[in-house]
Swiss-Prot record:
GO biological process: tRNA modification
Record-given protein name: tRNA uridine(34) hydroxylase
Its job: Catalyzes oxygen-dependent 5-hydroxyuridine (ho5U) modification at position 34 in tRNAs.
EC code(s) of this entry: 1.14.-.-
The keyword tRNA processing belongs to this UniProt entry's keyword annotation: yes
Source taxonomy: Bacteria, Pseudomonadati, Pseudomonadota, Gammaproteobacteria, Enterobacterales
Domain Rhodanese: from-to ranges: 146-240
Residues at the active site: 200 (cysteine persulfide intermediate)
Regions crossing the membrane: none
Keyword annotations: Oxidoreductase, tRNA processing
Family: Belongs to the TrhO family.
GO MF entries: oxidoreductase activity, acting on paired donors, with incorporation or reduction of molecular oxygen
Organism: Salmonella typhimurium (strain LT2 / SGSC1412 / ATCC 700720)
Reactions this protein catalyses: uridine(34) in tRNA + AH2 + O2 = 5-hydroxyuridine(34) in tRNA + A + H2O
């Protein structure tokens, strides 16, 4: 029986990836379809991906698959063929190719079985996730942005919205997708007669959100096909104005893809114009925040003086201090509440 999980340390794997000479392509894809045996499917797909030297993060559940991966360019066409023939439901599935890509997005393959491919908190047996809103392509998106009867809804987290979003899009203030869904219904009641356009990074969240809105009585619901990634790619290919402003946050080592030249966010420590996310260098904190190069140097990559001082302690003392809190911090390191409690975010610099 082959080993169906990684047994090499992260440091060794990362060093091996960085030493690679062959370029890689970063890809994301998802598909809602019924998987009778997620664990069996996971194990079979793991062997296919491992044989092709695929790195990345893949979630499987009874409701489908969600993947963010990198593939050696010489094996990209073979990967595409094997994925499309793995299951009839995956034949022709849209592959979102990264917009900015140095091939260093992942260094290990992790495949997990979960209850849902997107944690939505929905516990309603009458909900039909397949009853989704209509797709919008790039030209349609631009037309909707000029339609006074349309309302754009950003179904991403606060830290994603902060660095980039569509013009005049509404933010749903919540830390997680499961918290956003009921809030979106509540916030949009006053816009029930409007055209509701939902979007996210690659399409997986806004597709389910569109079905949830329809389930709650909204009739005029659309979502952007392929999310921000596919919109920007198609708009550029077709010579259309790109109406997304700023950076598209991504969940890998890059932490973002530049869509437009505008920098709409600010350093959380000094207020300077900046949209570069980082995790606090103190492993006992790991807070996700925006930090400019000057503050990165001043605070040694940390989010605060306290974390900077802790990072300077002997390693044994650091381990003692973070015992019992490290896992919790890594789980909640993106919450708005924790960000506000750790940092007194200044007003943007003049």
């Amino acid at each position: 029986m082959p080993v169906l999980h990684n047994r090499i340390s992260n440091d060794e794997l990362k060093a091996k990836m960085l030493a690679e000479s062959e370029p890689r392509t970063t890809i994301s894809f998802y598909k809602y379809f019924t998987i009778a045996s997620p664990q069996q499917t996971r194990d079979a797909l793991y062997q296919v991906f491992t044989a092709l030297d695929v790195f990345g993060r893949v979630y499987l559940a009874h409701e489908g698959i969600n993947a963010q991966i990198s593939v050696p360019q010489s094996k990209l066409e073979t990967f595409r063929q094997q994925l499309y023939t793995f299951d009839p439901a995956l034949d022709g599935v849209r592959l979102n190719i990264a917009l900015e890509d140095d091939g260093k997005s992942f260094w290990v393959l992790r495949m997990k079985v979960r209850d849902r491919i997107v944690a939505d908190g929905i516990d309603d047996p009458t909900f039909d996730a397949s009853n989704v809103g209509d797709y919008l392509k790039a030209a349609d998106v631009n037309a909707m942005l000029d339609d006074p009867d349309a309302v754009f809804i950003d179904m991403r987290n606060h830290y994603e919205y902060e660095v980039g979003h569509f013009e005049n899009a509404l933010e749903i203030p919540a830390d997680t997708f499961r918290e956003q869904l009921p809030k979106a219904v509540e916030m949009l009641r006053e816009h029930a007669d409007k055209k509701i356009v939902m979007y996210c990074t690659g399409g997986i969240r806004c597709e389910k959100a569109s079905a949830w809105m329809k389930h709650n009585g909204f009739n005029k619901v659309w979502h952007i096909e392929g999310g921000i990634i596919e919109y920007a790619r198609r708009a550029r290919a077709q010579g259309l104005p790109v109406r997304f402003i700023g950076k598209n946050f991504v969940f890998d080592e890059r932490m973002g893809e530049r869509i437009s030249d505008e920098v709409i966010a600010h350093c959380h420590q000094c207020g300077a114009s900046c949209d570069s996310h980082t995790n606090c260098k103190n492993d006992g904190c790991h807070l996700l925040f925006i930090q400019c190069p000057q503050c990165a140097s001043k605070f040694n990559g940390c989010c605060s003086e306290q974390c900077c001082e802790e990072l300077a302690l002997p390693e044994e003392e650091q381990r003692r201090r973070r015992a019992g809190r490290e896992n919790g911090n890594k789980i909640f390191n993106k919450s708005r509440g924790r960000l506000n409690s750790k940092l007194s975010i200044p007003d943007p610099a003049e």
